[in-house]
């Protein structure tokens, strides 16, 4: 899943709480052809298009935390739908294969092993791993994502199960040899619920099972916000206003979508972003032993602190 979504957590400090003498940082405005927030941040900026720094007197307005009562449902239930699929861009088969190889080698399980793709989204990794001989279950909350995943699996003549559910309520027990959660699909919830998800993963794994988690590195993205990111999707133009709440470490995004059929949509979402020591403690407290940390799939086992776009952490169930 790409993963991402919206406004849960504490509000940022109001603008009048800041020193009036402190000039705001320049706003980075990007024009790109890829839409995923995690790609923009984890790759150090847009891969395609032009990037310019505009000296701005006032940074973009801070996206507010979503009011769940006003909205009626949390942002992760609103974001991941058919319109979202229009913004996800394309990923090459070569990129999918490379990511699947990294996942496969990190988990280190035998062919035929049972593997859970947690927050599988459209299932591209699950389908690729199934084709390589693993028994894969894709788990996601979004029916729109799972429908696409099922269609793609049928096109590739792969048989695997996709399960609709909420990771906070996952009840698997000693069921999997390996679990992976990719593309910053973790951190949507409040602190206690995020910790509960890690506990659910621990319970779902067999003893000695491996958990591979990939999220954007807080220490990396902190240098690049606030920012405005424009990108083109399938029949839509999108703008993301991105801020980091430095108190709660939640990355807050206000996304505006303008469709070619004249519709426009606006949604706010936020994701808890972590530094390595925070993730390590979270995993250790849940009963895991951290085995390896990487910053990119191209450099397994190598992590360069704030210079690493991602935190890819492999942990073993104790």
What is each model feature region?
Residues 1-66:
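Low-complexity, Pro/Ser/Thr/Gly/Ala-rich intrinsically disordered linkers and tails that serve as
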Residues 55, 60-110, 112-119:
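Conserved class I S-adenosyl-L-methionine
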Residues 126-169:
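Class I SAM-dependent methyltransferase SAM/SAH-binding core
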Residues 171-178:
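A short acidic, Gly/Pro-enriched loop at the edge of an enzyme's catalytic core
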Residues 195-207:
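A short glycine-rich, Lys/Arg-flanked "PGG" loop and its adjoining helix->strand segment in the class I
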Residues 212-281:
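SAM-dependent methyltransferase
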Residues 276-318:
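C-terminal lobe and adjacent flexible extensions of AdoMet/dcAdoMet transferase-like proteins
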């Amino acid at each position: 899943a790409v993963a991402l979504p919206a406004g849960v957590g504490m509000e940022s400090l109001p603008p009048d709480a800041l020193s009036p003498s402190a000039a705001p940082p320049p706003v980075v405005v990007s024009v790109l052809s890829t839409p995923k927030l995690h790609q923009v941040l984890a790759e150090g900026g847009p891969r395609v298009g032009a990037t310019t720094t505009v000296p701005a007197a006032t940074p973009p307005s801070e996206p507010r935390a979503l009011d769940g009562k006003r909205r009626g449902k949390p942002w992760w239930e609103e974001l991941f739908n058919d319109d979202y699929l229009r913004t996800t861009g394309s990923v090459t088969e070569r990129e999918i294969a490379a990511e699947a190889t990294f996942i496969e080698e990190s988990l280190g399980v035998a062919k035929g092993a049972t593997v859970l793709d947690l927050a599988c989204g459209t299932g591209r990794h699950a389908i690729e791993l199934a084709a390589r001989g693993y028994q894969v279950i894709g788990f996601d909350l979004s029916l729109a994502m799972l429908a696409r995943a099922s269609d793609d699996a049928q096109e590739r003549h792969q048989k695997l199960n996709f399960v609709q559910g909420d990771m906070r309520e996952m009840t698997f027990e000693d069921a999997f040899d390996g679990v992976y959660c990719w593309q910053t699909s973790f951190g949507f919830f409040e602190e206690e619920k995020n910790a509960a998800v890690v506990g659910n993963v621990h319970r779902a794994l067999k003893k000695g099972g491996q958990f591979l988690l990939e999220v954007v590195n807080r220490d990396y993205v902190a240098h690049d916000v606030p920012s405005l990111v424009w990108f083109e999707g399938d029949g839509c133009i999108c703008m993301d206003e991105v801020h980091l709440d430095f108190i709660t470490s939640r990355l807050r995004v206000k996304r505006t979508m303008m469709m070619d059929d004249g519709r426009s949509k606006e949604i706010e979402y936020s994701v808890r972003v972590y530094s390595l020591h925070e993730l390590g403690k979270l995993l250790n407290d849940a009963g895991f032993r951290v085995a390896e940390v990487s910053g990119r799939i191209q450099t397994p086992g190598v992590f360069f602190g704030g210079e690493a776009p991602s935190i890819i952490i492999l942990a073993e169930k104790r």
